[in-house]
Amino acid sequence: MRRINSLYGRIGLLKRVPEKSTKQAHTFLASLSFSTEGAYGGDGEFQQNSSKVKIFDRDLKRIHRDRAAWLSRQKNDSFVDAVADNLLDRLEDCKKSFPTAFCLGGSLGAVKRLLRGRGGIEKLIMMDTSYDMIKSCRDAQDDSLDNSIETSYFVGDEEFLPVKESSVDLIISSLGLHWTNDLPGSMIQCKLALKPDGLFLAAILGGETLKELRIACTLAHMEREGGISPRLSPLAQVRDAGNLLTRAGFSLPGVDVDEYVVKYKRAMDLIEHLRAMGETNALLERNKILNRETAVATAAIYDSMFATEDGTIPATFQVIYMTGWREHSSHPQAKRRGSATVSFTDLQKQFGGQS
């Protein structure tokens, strides 16, 4: 578990990339985007399925991202940076290079700023549903950035990736994919967009995120309104992450979890931080009106139940890190069932065990 006490430290602006690089990104864009309204069939193809359930309001989430671009301008978020840096650390464990990288939504600026030459990236393509977020990232400048990386930007949707199959070497998504209505479908599209032996890296918020706020909200609603109203969005559980990677068809899947505890002076500071990250509620079936008495009760319950000795209140963020590779002949393959030439009984006898 990691503890982060300070937020919003100032940083320099990001390096502006020439507009001409945007045109070169079209080499990787398909004329028709993949469709997420489908399922992964046994033949390895993405198949149509009209029964997709919509949980999140994607238009509202785009508005949240637009607002976050304005709120987070010229500011450094310690939590967002820690997650992005931890995710990118996995590139240091890879011996190969990834010339073409595709970054999906989430903390675009942090990923770009913290790459620091990792992964041998030569071309970086950055996509977000929010035009304002893309513009903010593109227009920023930072002398610490690697100018040798050719960077392009465009607006797109994680649910309909406008990328050609087998066109990129690396896909990175830091704190972005958990807002998709069809997470398995989005991951399948990511897998198809990768070249053979391409790498998928993602960090999403897990189900234990904001558990303190969930408890406080539930108790406040029961006390003031006599029932429960969904105020926080549902998130994937750790046990689901491995199944998601396997269902998407990734080989050598890997999942690990980290918890970050961020401290705030008051409950309103937590809400402001969530807005600055674009992480506020986007449920389709949400109560759009928050009773003032319920809000005050939530803050009071939060403080009484979870306040620490130093007067701050903690908020837990559970981050699930996922890695997966597109299949390649160089990857280890499981042996066919029944192909073993030595039995466990023989091994036990050989090493002096008792039967």
UniProtKB/Swiss-Prot annotation:
Pfam families: Methyltransf_11
Transit peptide interval: 1-34
EC number: 2.1.1.-
A Gene Ontology biological process term: biosynthetic process
MF terms in GO: S-adenosylmethionine-dependent methyltransferase activity
Compartments where found: Mitochondrion
Entry keyword annotation includes Transit peptide: yes
The entry's keywords: Methyltransferase, Mitochondrion, Transferase, Transit peptide
Keyword Phosphoprotein (UniProt): no
GO cellular component, as recorded: mitochondrion
InterPro entries assigned: Malonyl-ACP_OMT (IPR050602), Methyltransf_11 (IPR013216), SAM-dependent_MTases_sf (IPR029063)
UniProt cross-references to CDD domains, sorted A to Z: AdoMet_MTases (cd02440)
PANTHER family named in the record: ARGININE-HYDROXYLASE NDUFAF5, MITOCHONDRIAL
Family the UniProt entry places it in: Belongs to the methyltransferase superfamily.
UniProt name for this protein: Putative methyltransferase At1g22800, mitochondrial
Source organism per UniProt: Arabidopsis thaliana
